[in-house]
């Protein structure tokens, strides 16, 4: 349900995403750690986009072409997953992990600011 509106067309490997797309779409979420943290910390961040970003980060691998910048900085997929998990737990949003492929509910309910 949530991922359907955020599916991106496949791009040739090696093509660089535009900066705006890199910042705003789950396909390229996490290309810049500082930007990812800024987006996840916004109080007006919507539940469905937060789930999409957290799912993308949880499934990201350091060898992926979408996280080339992380590879240059030495960022590992495990660190990305941990950061996504911490952000989701603070906001009370479920996160889908690659191993379980199911939503893990956090204790508190997500409340999006209008």
Curated annotation (Swiss-Prot):
Residues 1-24 are annotated as: Disordered. Expressed in kidney and liver. It comes from the Eukaryota. This is Putative uncharacterized protein ANKRD13C-DT. It comes from Homo sapiens.
